[in-house]
Design a protein with these regions (language model features):
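A short, N-terminal "cap"/entry segment at the start of jelly-roll beta-barrel domains
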Residues: 1-37, 121-134
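Conserved short histidine dyad/triad with adjacent acidic residue
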Residues: 26-29, 41-56
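Conserved GNAT-family N-acetyltransferase fold
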Residues: 43, 62, 86
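Tight coil/turn sites that cap or link beta-strands
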Residues: 46-48, 83, 91, 101
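Glycine- and acidic-residue-biased ligand/ion/polar-headgroup-sensing regions
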Residues: 59-69, 74
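Short acidic-glycine-tyrosine-enriched beta hairpin
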Residues: 75-91
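A short hydrophobic beta-strand segment most commonly corresponding to one strand
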Residues: 87, 101-118
């Protein structure tokens, strides 16, 4: 079992296809660390990049450590910068948008584990999260 996971060592999954999609890196999950409580990963978004509005039955903590983001949770937009955590309750619509001029770097932690398998299925199919009608 791994106890230390560094960026670049995790499983990289391309959501939306490799050419025009966005990479998500899975760093901590049951398969590699034996965790039973959560999955943790990271992603970078270029200026203007976004994660579409979606929901899932998992609690999620987003932690921005570089850049500026608009994270919308349950219809309420929150402008956040470095060193900011955002909690997303289960089954609540949310999205992420890089509103800064630099790359947005963030981590996500989902509890319980399992959403890493959704990421794998989306990547295998060349899809991103399904878009939600406005």
């Amino acid at each position: 079992m791994n106890h230390v996971s560094r960026r670049g060592d995790g499983e990289i999954l391309w959501l939306g296809g490799h050419e025009h999609g966005r990479p998500v890196e899975i760093l901590v999950e049951p398969r590699t660390t034996g965790t039973r409580a959560f999955t943790m990963g990271a992603q970078n978004l270029p200026p203007g990049g976004h994660v579409p509005t979606h929901r899932h039955p998992y609690e999620e903590i987003l932690f921005v450590y570089q850049g500026r983001a608009r994270i919308t949770v349950d219809g309420v937009p929150h402008e956040v910068g470095p060193e900011t955590a955002v909690f997303v309750p289960p089954d609540v619509y949310h999205s992420i948008e890089n509103v800064g001029e630099a790359e947005l770097r963030l981590t996500f932690t989902l509890s319980p584990p399992g959403y890493e398998n959704v990421f794998r299925e989306l990547a295998r199919a060349g899809n991103d999260h399904p878009r939600v009608p406005a």
